[in-house]
Amino acid sequence: MAHRDIDQALAWANDEIHHPTRDWHELCLSFCRSSYGLPPVAPSAIDLWHKIPHHHKHHGPAEAAPRGAFVYFDYPGAGHVTLKARHTLISTDYCHPGKVC
């Protein structure tokens, strides 16, 4: 899997909205890392959040996250992660189970 820069990652993620390559149900972390062409590094969004060094974490509203950032949410169970676009979040399962929006 080739690594992608921010523009390429967001383009790939936007393509998944209109031309999905798979069902992304409960695969938010897989979707986000796939957008950048990254290999698996943790079994869930919450596990990856806990692996990130404190000095690399930015707490605050999702709107303040930089473009291309992973935005984490403390949902019950595995947590949730989305990808920050310019003015919105690209997420799995938000609009419909398994879909990207």
Show the residue positions of the predicted features.
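...with weaker cross-activation on analogous glycine-rich loops/strands in unrelated enzymes
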Residues: 41-101
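N-terminal capping segments
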Residues: 1-54, 80
